Every structure is written in C-alpha cells, then in structure tokens.
Amino acid sequence: MAKQKKQSPGTIALNKKALHDYFIEQKFEAGLVLAGWEVKSLRAGKAQLVDSYVLLKDGEAWLMGAHITPLTSASTHVIADPTRTRKLLLNKRELGKLFGAVQQKGYACVALSLYWKKHMIKCEIALAKGKKEFDKRHTEKERDSDREIQRAMRTKGKDD
C-alpha cells in the first residue's frame, strides 16, 4: 500500500478533487464564521471539503457543502448540522474580484483547504476554470513522467 503524504502541521483538510478538476487561476485567504462545536471538531481534524464550493450572493461569500463531523462529546444543547452553510470573511476588494470573475463563462470559486493561522481557522479559496477530460489526462501523464524522472534520478545515484 502506498504511503500517505503527511499534511503540513497547520492543515486541517484539503480538497484534492478541486486540484484535479480545475485550473487554479488565483487564490484567496478567507476567514470562517464557525460555531463552538465546529472549532472543536476541526481541532480533531473531522472535516471534508470534497464537494464544497463557494456561493457568491448579495455581496457576501458562503461556503457550501463542506462537511464538519460533530464530535459526540460536543454540543449537547445545540443540534449540530454538519453541512450547514458557513459565511466566508473577505474584504470588499477581494469580493469584487470574485464577483467579476465568476460572471465570466467557465469560472468557478472553490474551496481548496482549511488550515490554522495562529489561533484562527482560515479557508483557502480559489478562482478556478474547469478542466476538460483531455486536460485531466494530460496532467496525469505529466505527473507520471515526472515520477519516472525522479525514480531514475534516485536509482542513478545508488548505482555508483
């Protein structure tokens, strides 16, 4: 079985599917409005961003489809909704860029990762353009050839 890559210490969750399905044009860092039980769950690493996206409406950005699994010990008096819509905190200039770009055909706004920055949880969102099927195959071929080159470089050093 292949070794799992270690995430950097501040990373809570990654959206690898977005990196596979989209060309990333521009990245933004956004704050999140969270409830207390959500922060506890994120400390435990119980988050998934696989089918999440960013919805832009009424001059605000919202994180949709992100799944934060509630802990069994947390939130006994509050009903925890794991896939609730969460508000993203961006400044007006960044929101303007996102609104303008998403209006263009083919652009989408997706969540790439959740991570800790000091004591706050941040969400990295990206302005992205969808990949076609042949683009995905081309990216996979490039990745395979890079892997072969790296393997050859490692074995070349050991032959000496």
From Swiss-Prot:
Region (Disordered): 131-160
Residues making up the signal peptide according to the UniProt record: none
Gene Ontology molecular functions: RNA binding
Secreted among keywords: no
Keywords: Cytoplasm, RNA-binding
This protein's record includes keyword ATP-binding: no
GO BP: trans-translation
InterPro entries the UniProt entry points to: SmpB, SsrA-bd_prot, SsrA-bd_prot_CS
Pfam families linked: SmpB (PF01668)
Protein's cellular compartments: Cytoplasm
A GO cellular component annotation in the UniProt record: cytosol
PROSITE patterns xref list: SSRP
Function, in words: Required for rescue of stalled ribosomes mediated by trans-translation. Binds to transfer-messenger RNA (tmRNA), required for stable association of tmRNA with ribosomes. tmRNA and SmpB together mimic tRNA shape, replacing the anticodon stem-loop with SmpB. tmRNA is encoded by the ssrA gene; the 2 termini fold to resemble tRNA(Ala) and it encodes a 'tag peptide', a short internal open reading frame. During trans-translation Ala-aminoacylated tmRNA acts like a tRNA, entering the A-site of stalled ribosomes, displacing the stalled mRNA.
UniProt record similarity statement: Belongs to the SmpB family.
Protein's name according to its UniProt entry: SsrA-binding protein
